[in-house]
From Swiss-Prot:
Belongs to the acetyl-CoA hydrolase/transferase family. Its EC number is 3.1.2.1. The active site is at E302 (5-glutamyl coenzyme a thioester intermediate). InterPro entries: AcetylCoA_hyd_C, AcetylCoA_hyd_C_sf, ActCoA_hydro, ActCoA_hydro_N, NagB/RpiA_transferase-like. One of its GO terms (biological process) is acetate metabolic process. The gene is ACH1. This is Acetyl-CoA hydrolase. Keywords: Cytoplasm, Hydrolase. Presumably involved in regulating the intracellular acetyl-CoA pool for fatty acid and cholesterol synthesis and fatty acid oxidation. It is found in: Cytoplasm. GO terms for cellular component: mitochondrion.
Length: 523
């Protein structure tokens, strides 16, 4: 097979050039029921050529539902996993996904999905937890990993994400490398800690966001590399959801809170390392920090979006660590155009490091994430709408919220339904599913205001949340629920965290039956 000049330039380990194959030749390697690992995290850095070739093979041979895989990715992959779901090619999936087709297949019961703390998922996979029913002793049959270069020793330089790739490679029977020549090489941007299992594991030595102590590429046994494929497709990330009045209001409340914490000496003037999720609220918060007086900020997070580039450019952000750079096309272009500047201020690490609870606690990270709903006592649901319908998965929110110095959740106070512009209240009497407990949250923010929950008893928290965070349409309804619950609990001497269990999920039932959470009464 003829090897392109671009591929020769990227593959500096000569023996791999003999393993370059057209993607079509790899199809016979894949069998129904295999355990497959992909590189990628939050839609970037995932393989493209091999998954697309398998989709074409399934289409042309009517193999929908007959060629299905147990698919493991560090978090969400690119659009290819949604196409796999549409073609009934996924038997089992973990630990996080994004996209309507795959979520539909999960909620239709066609895909067995489990979510897991992202800091734990790769290591648990290496322990054999997810392949314990296999009789051949293998963990993964194949790992398909995207590289932007291969070094002289055969090690792999990832692209815009690291995720769980080091762990997948360490336990994979065979490895296929997709070298993406459509994107520039990311060499020099990574700091890779290879997995070491207990009892031989040592502490991660990082005491500052900008410290590096690992490798700049992922080692691999060349004997296990069965093929190298050239990929010529860049990551496609849709435009970021722009901030709006609601998200900007949330950002203002948060910036004011940070300023107050600095005035009272509970935070330094440059805060502590920031962690922020994705979405329009997260973007608005970063925009708010861009416009604020805070300087010399640092970031220790999972994912960097376009808005962080603005923080770099205005001089407010000194350094950022993540496991993924999820940029739009314009964002990536800006990133590559300013490579010499940005690359000095950025490090991509494995997700077991970026999400490591001990490091998050050591560094004093300020964590900010968006829930589906939060109840009056500060239990948060991040995953299951009305307790049952899976959205994306837990992700890394609990890694950060359980261990951060400041654990913050932010959301609009109300969301629309088809018949009611404020038909869904983010604040509910009892969360229909709990991912983060009352013991994990310090601060709750909506467009209505901010509730500082530190040191408050459950009943104090409830009053603070209803007063400061609930939408005005729901404040009297929630207050009535709390008053009645306290009256009932006082009679039965159970005043610590009062509830009326017969009415605890009346918001959700009313939403299902009438299209709004605005209950008429609690009788």
């Amino acid at each position: 097979m003829t090897v392109s000049r671009l591929l020769k330039d990227r593959v500096r380990y000569a023996p791999y050039l003999k393993k370059v194959k057209p993607v079509e030749e790899l199809i016979p390697l894949f069998k129904d029921g295999q355990y497959i690992g992909w590189s990628g995290f939050t839609g970037v850095g995932a393989p493209k050529a091999v998954p697309e070739a398998l989709i074409k093979h399934v289409e042309e041979n009517n193999l929908q539902g007959k060629l299905r895989f147990n698919l493991f990715v560090g978090a969400s992959a690119g659009p290819e996993e949604c196409k796999w779901a549409e073609h009934d090619m996924i038997l089992r999936r973990a630990p996080h996904q994004v996209g309507k087709p795959i979520a539909k297949a999960i909620n239709d019961g066609r895909i067995q999905f489990f979510d897991k703390h992202l800091s734990m998922f790769p290591q648990d996979l290496t322990y054999g937890y997810y392949s314990r029913n296999r009789t051949d002793g293998k963990i993964l049959d194949y790992t398909i990993i995207e590289a932007t270069a291969i070094k002289e020793d055969g090690s792999i330089v990832p692209g815009p994400s690291v995720g769980g790739s080091p762990e997948f490679i360490s336990v994979s029977d065979k490895i296929i490398i997709e070298v993406n020549t459509a994107t520039p090489s990311f060499e020099g941007l990574h700091d890779i800690d290879m997995p070491v299992n207990p009892p031989f594991r040592q502490p991660y030595p990082y005491t500052a966001v900008d410290q590096k102590n690992g490798l700049d590429s992922i080692p691999v046994d060349p004997e296990r590399v069965v093929a190298v494929v050239e990929s010529t497709q860049r990551d496609v990330v849709g435009p970021n959801t722009p901030s709006d009045a609601t998200s900007q209001s949330i950002a203002r409340h948060l910036v004011e809170f940070f300023e107050n914490e600095v005035r009272h000496g509970r935070l330094p003037e440059n805060l502590h390392p920031l962690q922020s999720g994705i979405g329009n609220i997260a973007n608005a918060v970063i925009e708010g920090l861009t416009d604020s007086s805070f300087k010399n900020l640092t970031v220790w997070t999972e994912v960097l979006q376009d808005s962080f580039l603005d923080l770099f450019e205005n001089g407010a952000l000194d350094y950022a660590t993540a496991t993924s750079i999820r940029l739009t096309e314009a964002g990536f272009q800006k990133f590559f155009d300013n490579w010499d500047d940005f690359s000095k201020k950025l490090c991509l690490r494995s997700q077991v490091v970026s999400n490591n609870p001990e490091l998050i606690r050591r560094l004093g990270v300020i964590a900010m994430n968006t829930p589906v709903e939060v109840d009056i006592y500060a239990h948060a649901n991040s995953t299951n709408v009305s307790g049952s319908r899976m959205l994306n998965g837990l992700g890394g929110s609990a890694d950060f919220l359980r261990n951060a110095k400041l654990s913050i959740m932010h959301a609009p106070a109300a969301r629309p339904t088809k018949t009611d512009p404020t038909g869904i209240s983010t604040i509910v009497p009892m969360a229909s599913h709990v991912d983060q407990t009352e013991h994990d949250l310090d601060v709750l923010v909506t467009d209505q205001g901010l509730a500082d929950l530190r040191g408050l008893s459950p009943r104090e928290r409830a009053r603070e949340i209803i007063k400061n965070c609930a939408h005005p349409d729901y404040q009297p309804i929630l207050t009535d629920y709390l008053d009645r619950s306290e009256h009932y609990a006082k009679l039965h001497k159970c005043m610590h965290e009062p509830h009326m269990l017969k009415n605890a999920f009346k918001f959700h039932l009313n939403l299902s039956e009438k299209g709004t959470m605005k209950v008429d009464n609690w009788d």
